[in-house]
Amino acid sequence: MAAVTTDLIRELRERTSAGMMDCKKALEENNADIEKAITWLREKGIAKAAKKAGRETKEGRVVSYIHGNGKIGVLVELNSETDFVSKNEDFEALGKEICMQIAAMNPLYLNEESIPAADLEKEKTIMRSQLEAEGKKADQIEKILPGKIKKYVSEVCLVNQAFFKDDSKTIDDLVKEAIAKFGENITIARFIRFQVGGL
């Protein structure tokens, strides 16, 4: 298998505007063949989604979901570029899927950028203490910590969570697929989850 170098990742990123991790995965899946990686990204809709990511999303809708027992409710603001897309049944279905994800998985934040710095620092401190208690040395801790933080982010941030119906993709992947399908940018603006007896 050919090596995936940073130069290859950079070139693929420049040619497709896809994210660095998406480019790396595309190259790994295609034996470092850049042309096949571009095709792979296009098939996945990632290249298309990345190109549309900068566009403003001024239209949209608020989608709601009440869990069967009536004890959990979710509201999601899902935005699109045009009202044509936001009025589409598939757009509403996407919103429902995201609502059910929130009801089931209870994310605390939308994305990594929305985690308050103090909260992230607190988690890092807890993780460091746990690793020290396990007898890990300082240099080992610094190597282990990024992986633990990534796992934490994938648990508490909606867009990083594995999709509850198909854990081979994240909510971010689900949105990118919708962007490719609709041909315009779609964003999750915010969400709120209510639970009887919860805060």
Curated annotation (Swiss-Prot):
Residues 82-85 are annotated as: Involved in Mg(2+) ion dislocation from EF-Tu. Keywords: Cytoplasm, Elongation factor, Protein biosynthesis. Pfam families: EF_TS. Gene3D superfamilies: 1.10.286.20, DNA helicase RuvA subunit, C-terminal domain (1.10.8.10), Elongation factor Ts, dimerisation domain (3.30.479.20). It is found in: Cytoplasm. GO terms for biological process: translational elongation. InterPro entries: EF-Ts_dimer_sf, Transl_elong_EFTs/EF1B, Transl_elong_EFTs/EF1B_dimer, Transl_elong_Ts_CS, UBA-like_sf. One of its GO terms (molecular function) is translation elongation factor activity. One of its GO terms (cellular component) is cytoplasm. SUPFAM superfamilies: Elongation factor Ts (EF-Ts), dimerisation domain, UBA-like. Associates with the EF-Tu.GDP complex and induces the exchange of GDP to GTP. It remains bound to the aminoacyl-tRNA.EF-Tu.GTP complex up to the GTP hydrolysis stage on the ribosome. Belongs to the EF-Ts family. NCBIfam families: tsf. This is Elongation factor Ts. It comes from Leptospira interrogans serogroup Icterohaemorrhagiae serovar Lai (strain 56601). The gene is tsf.
